[in-house]
Amino acid sequence: MPSKQYRVDRLAQEIQKDVDEILLKRVRDPRVQNVTITGVDVTGDLQQATIYYSILSDLASDAEKAQAGLDKATGLIRSELGARLNIFKTPEIKFVRDPSVAYGSRIDQLINDLHKKEK
């Protein structure tokens, strides 16, 4: 008997793939053009999905615009997911900016600063 976690992980992968495709092909909002889906967390009961994203720009105004665009497109994305996924109830989705990308950039910057000081 397959574990429940396997199903949750498989659904998270499917949601990530489908949301990425929906953003590319169906959502026409220019605020979400530079958005990349980096991960999805689905609750054990498959009722909620947190979708993590990153953007190319480091500007706070661009991050706010991207969040507003994703919030506006949530209904369309959820209905498209409902048509694509073979599950009883489509999970509620929430978009959250992925903090690991900014953290990684900060670490790179600190390492580069150390190398410059050594020279």
Swiss-Prot record:
PROSITE patterns: RBFA
Task performed by this protein: One of several proteins that assist in the late maturation steps of the functional core of the 30S ribosomal subunit. Associates with free 30S ribosomal subunits (but not with 30S subunits that are part of 70S ribosomes or polysomes). Required for efficient processing of 16S rRNA. May interact with the 5'-terminal helix region of 16S rRNA.
Gene this chain is encoded by: rbfA
The organism's place on the tree of life at top rank: Bacteria
Protein name stated in the entry: Ribosome-binding factor A
Primary localization: cytoplasm
GO cellular component: cytosol
Subcellular location: Cytoplasm
Record keywords, A-Z: Cytoplasm, Ribosome biogenesis
Subunit details: Monomer. Binds 30S ribosomal subunits, but not 50S ribosomal subunits or 70S ribosomes.
Entry-linked HAMAP family: RbfA (MF_00003)
Pfam families in UniProt: RBFA
A GO BP entry: maturation of SSU-rRNA
InterPro entries the UniProt entry points to: KH_dom-like_a/b, RbfA, RbfA_dom_sf, Ribosome-bd_factorA_CS
Family: Belongs to the RbfA family.
One function term, GO molecular function aspect: ribosomal small subunit binding
Coiled-coil features, chain-numbered ranges: none
